[in-house]
């Protein structure tokens, strides 16, 4: 069952969950059907991530997805969600130019989608921008460690926060908390470093490839439930094999058509 006991989850419930030692659950969602299922299952937060560029639109990188595309997906998720807190990524190119640009992008997301918060990547360097968004009345989730929008400057998909760089991870996390973020995603960082950050902060930490010491976990649902039949990251645990099930179902459908057994009497008027 969910770690948060509420009919409608608000940002304050995440801080309360941390104080009470309750773990929180997060899944990505990009459409109404998956959002409804995950919401009814009891997930605490639904993240409309820019990972939609990969798992929905078939692109190689998250850098290409636009704010307009994110808004279309987020609208579908919020329409279907009654309980979970819906958070929407600000995609690459929508907040880096200036804090004013970031506030305008965040306002569009909130006004046009009905989401409860936005997520933004970056550490100390983005703290002022986060403060401006928060001051505009918009809740923010931060994202540090491996940040996919910075994949080229980081040298690819590599673990962050090892050795001496663990100090930067803590500094980034503190900066986001001081800027007003109510939660922060820690992606692909050593478990011990993530645990130290979690113990240092009063806001919620959400891990992805960051060990079991964070306040919660997030996975891309197509990875977690096996819709993606390709290679998956090491940190993914597969809870179902939906890709294989859909493949087999499609083959059965095709076979019934070729055999002339579908539709039958039960499916006819």
Curated annotation (Swiss-Prot):
Pathway: Cofactor biosynthesis; (R)-pantothenate biosynthesis; (R)-pantoate from 3-methyl-2-oxobutanoate: step 1/2
Cofactor note: Binds 1 Mg(2+) ion per subunit.
Protein residues bound to 3-methyl-2-oxobutanoate: 50-51, 89, 119
Keywords of this entry: Cytoplasm, Magnesium, Metal-binding, Pantothenate biosynthesis, Transferase
Enzyme class: transferase
Annotated EC: 2.1.2.11
Alphabetical GO biological process terms: pantothenate biosynthetic process
Cofactor: Mg(2+)
Subcellular location: Cytoplasm
First-listed, main subcellular location of the protein, grouped into a coarse class: cytoplasm
SUPFAM superfamilies: Phosphoenolpyruvate/pyruvate domain
GO CC, any one term: cytoplasm
Residues of the active site: 187 (proton acceptor)
Gene Ontology MF term list: 3-methyl-2-oxobutanoate hydroxymethyltransferase activity; magnesium ion binding
Binding residue positions for Mg(2+): 50, 89, 121
Pfam families recorded: Pantoate_transf
Catalytic activity of the protein: 3-methyl-2-oxobutanoate + (6R)-5,10-methylene-5,6,7,8-tetrahydrofolate + H2O = 2-dehydropantoate + (6S)-5,6,7,8-tetrahydrofolate
Functional description taken from the UniProt entry: Catalyzes the reversible reaction in which hydroxymethyl group from 5,10-methylenetetrahydrofolate is transferred onto alpha-ketoisovalerate to form ketopantoate.
Similarity field: Belongs to the PanB family.
Subunit-level organization: Homodecamer; pentamer of dimers.
Matches recorded under HAMAP family: PanB
Designated name of the protein: 3-methyl-2-oxobutanoate hydroxymethyltransferase
UniProt organism field: Corynebacterium glutamicum (strain ATCC 13032 / DSM 20300 / JCM 1318 / BCRC 11384 / CCUG 27702 / LMG 3730 / NBRC 12168 / NCIMB 10025 / NRRL B-2784 / 534)
């Amino acid at each position: 069952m969910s770690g948060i006991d509420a009919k409608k989850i608000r940002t304050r419930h995440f801080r309360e969950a941390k104080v009470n030692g309750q773990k929180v659950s997060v899944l990505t969602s990009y459409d109404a059907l998956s959002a409804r299922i995950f919401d009814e299952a009891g997930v605490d937060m639904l993240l409309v991530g820019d990972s939609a560029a990969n798992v929905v639109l078939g692109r190689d990188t998250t850098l290409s997805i636009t704010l307009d595309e994110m808004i279309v997906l987020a609208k579908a998720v919020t329409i279907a969600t009654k309980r979970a807190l819906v958070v929407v990524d600000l995609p690459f190119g929508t907040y880096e130019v200036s804090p004013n640009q970031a506030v305008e992008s965040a306002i569009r997301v909130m006004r046009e989608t009905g989401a409860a918060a936005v997520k933004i990547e970056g550490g100390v360097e983005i703290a002022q921008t986060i403060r401006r968004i928060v001051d505009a009345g918009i809740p923010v989730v931060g994202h540090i460690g491996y940040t996919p929008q910075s994949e080229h400057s980081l040298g690819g998909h590599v673990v962050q926060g090892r050795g001496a760089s663990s100090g930067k991870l803590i500094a980034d996390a503190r900066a986001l908390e001081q800027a007003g973020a109510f939660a922060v995603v820690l992606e692909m960082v050593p478990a011990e470093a993530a645990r130290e950050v979690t113990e240092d902060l009063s806001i919620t930490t959400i891990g992805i490839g960051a060990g079991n010491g964070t306040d919660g976990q997030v996975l891309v649902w197509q990875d977690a439930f096996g819709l993606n039949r390709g290679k998956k990251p090491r940190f993914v645990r597969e809870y179902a094999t939906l890709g294989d099930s859909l493949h087999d179902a499609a083959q059965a459908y095709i076979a019934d058509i070729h055999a002339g057994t579908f539709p039958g009497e039960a499916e006819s008027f």
